[in-house]
Amino acid sequence: MIQRISHITIYVLDQDAAFDFYVNKLGFEVNTDATMDGGFRWLTVSSKGQPDLEIALMPTGPGPMRDQETSDMLRALIQKGALGSGVLETADIHKTYEELKAKGVEFSQPPTERFYGIEALLKDYSGNWFSLTQRTEASAKKPK
């Protein structure tokens, strides 16, 4: 029986830039940063509040899992923002929004009230977008 999700993958155009974004901008912690045989870099990070869920920052280049044509298509989709969405939760969205903006994080939407809480939208350096969300009392009353 499956017990939990241990890793998820986010495809990135440049692992060094992704390291800077997720660690230095978002404040995630590095779990693993290792170079394997053949030069493949295994880079995982996690949020401080959820260290047992690792995010693998996966390069898009060709290799054992994909050919050059597939790699090129994957890169194009990422750059258009068509892949890699997720929800990042915070207790104080307005404070976090201002802190991240001051660090140079690009937002496409400022904090906005929604039925599920307050949400702002941000992108990483590759083009992957995320919802930064704060739950509210109203968000506990979901529409049916």
Task: State each model region's role.
Residues 58-71, 109, 113, 134-137:
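Acetyl-CoA-dependent GNAT
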Residues 75-76:
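A detector for short, charged/polar N-terminal pre-domain segments
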Residues 1, 10, 33, 41-46, ...:
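Vicinal oxygen chelate
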Residues 5-7, 82-85:
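Eukaryotic phosphotyrosine signaling hubs
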